[in-house]
């Protein structure tokens, strides 16, 4: 992986309006990739096919398409081409400008109006790591808070480019550390705070409606952009992503979603297999990390006593989590989030496949499933005319651990 060549062909390169003065120093606007094994979508492929790209969009795909006269042709010599993968969870910092607003919620941890795309605080190293795995697009979430704000979508260029400003509201159950006197200071307090904020939002929107209908009989309502943003997100059935650390947090997320009629998504913990029956009614969309627990060190005598039966059982079952969720009929995507070593990502994908989940399902969890959930199914996740030319070129099959990524196109 370290020796693989990463090529970024941004649509920004195609947007220049100045006259071309030296052809050899200007990137071509039209490309044709020939002689490739093209994985157009999970389960579908074209052997010996070609892809024509114009201005950052796929113009044609097929086995017998003609190379446009103005195209720069590249012979891929049988390399495999996949639609660019979608990283379902990437975090960025808080937009500090939003903290200056006088119309915000009294608690700085409640910022549903905050948008992740307004503060692209992402290290270049992190972007390069994701591209080295084949990711070309990311679902970007705010990093801090209880009501963290709105996620968005970016292309993983050297200078990330937002392509959708608002996807979902993000909720975290994390409470403030002990020793701090600010509310909330316990899990019980966080849950109460989340519920009260939803009730406050309901009250705020209803009060606005009453004032609009009877302005002469009521005092004007103080503007609160936080409660308004939260209410509007619910009104348009925007997804609410709950960050979980085990199966009990997932249950809490489902309970809150049922109480307030939310469209729930769950950033998983890897323990979902323990409560499959609990998700059957609401059918949330799962964003699943694959940072499996490391092998317990039980070589030395008595060292096995430091591990509980539950820990040993989870170590054994964790790679099966996606298999169980798929068999239960749940939709999910895969994320590299939480992985300390991104180089383990493809190895862990192979573990999932070895445990029985098909390559097509795994590929769909990296492409078509997140694209559909994010509302980008007409431009991302497939290799087809009209789609963004976000591509991953591999010298063999992606799920073959010996294969190397040759280039990434964005």
Residue ranges and their predicted role:
Residues 48, 213-316, 333, 372-374, ...:
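Active-site core of metal-dependent hydrolases
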Residues 27, 98, 102-106, 111-113, ...:
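His/Asp/Glu-enriched, well-ordered alpha-helical/loop segment
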Residues 36-39, 47, 372, 384, ...:
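C-terminal cap of metal-dependent C-N hydrolases
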Residues 36, 51, 56, 78, ...:
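Divalent metal-coordination and catalytic microenvironments
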Residues 131-268:
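Polyanionic/metal-chelating signatures
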Residues 3-13:
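Sec-dependent N-terminal signal peptides
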Residues 18, 23-25, 29, 38, ...:
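Histidine-rich, glycine-flanked metal-binding segment
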């Amino acid at each position: 992986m370290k020796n693989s060549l990463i090529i970024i062909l941004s649509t920004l390169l195609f947007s220049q309006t100045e006259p071309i003065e030296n052809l050899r120093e200007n990137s071509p606007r039209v490309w044709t990739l020939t002689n490739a094994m093209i994985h157009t979508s999970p389960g579908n492929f074209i052997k010996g096919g070609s892809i024509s790209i114009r201005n950052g969009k796929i113009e044609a795909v097929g086995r017998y398409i003609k190379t446009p006269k103005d195209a720069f042709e590249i012979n891929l010599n049988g390399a495999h081409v996949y639609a660019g993968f979608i990283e379902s969870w990437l975090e960025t910092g808080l937009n500090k400008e939003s903290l200056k607003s006088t119309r915000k919620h009294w608690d700085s941890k409640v910022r549903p109006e905050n948008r992740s795309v307004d503060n692209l605080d992402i290290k270049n190293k992190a972007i390069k790591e994701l591209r080295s795995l084949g990711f070309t697009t990311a679902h970007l979430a705010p990093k801090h808070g209880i009501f963290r704000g709105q996620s968005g979508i970016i292309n993983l260029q050297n200078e990330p480019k937002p392509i959708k400003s608002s996807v979902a509201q993000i909720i975290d159950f994390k409470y403030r550390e002990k020793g701090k006197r600010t509310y909330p200071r316990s899990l019980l307090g966080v849950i109460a705070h989340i519920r009260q904020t939803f009730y406050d939002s309901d009250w705020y929107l209803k009060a606005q409606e009453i004032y609009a209908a009877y302005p002469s009989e009521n005092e004007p309502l103080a503007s609160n952009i936080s409660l308004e943003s939260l209410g509007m997100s619910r009104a348009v059935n925007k997804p609410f992503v709950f960050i979980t650390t085990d199966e009990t947090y997932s249950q809490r997320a489902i309970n809150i979603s049922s109480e307030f009629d939310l469209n729930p998504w769950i950033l998983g913990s890897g323990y979902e297999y323990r409560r499959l029956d609990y998700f059957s009614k609401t059918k949330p969309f799962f964003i699943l990390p694959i940072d499996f627990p490391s092998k317990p060190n039980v070589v030395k005598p008595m060292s096995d006593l430091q591990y509980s039966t539950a820990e040993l059982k989870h170590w054994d079952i964790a790679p099966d989590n996606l298999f169980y969720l798929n068999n239960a009929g749940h939709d999910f995507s895969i994320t590299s989030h939480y992985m300390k070593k991104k180089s383990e990502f493809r190895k862990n994908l192979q573990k999932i496949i070895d445990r029985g989940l098909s390559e097509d399902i795994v590929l769909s969890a990296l492409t078509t499933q997140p694209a559909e959930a994010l509302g980008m199914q007409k431009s991302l996740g497939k290799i087809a005319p009209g789609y963004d030319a976000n591509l991953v070129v591999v010298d063999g099959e992606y799920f073959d651990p010996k294969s190397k990524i040759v280039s990434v196109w964005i």
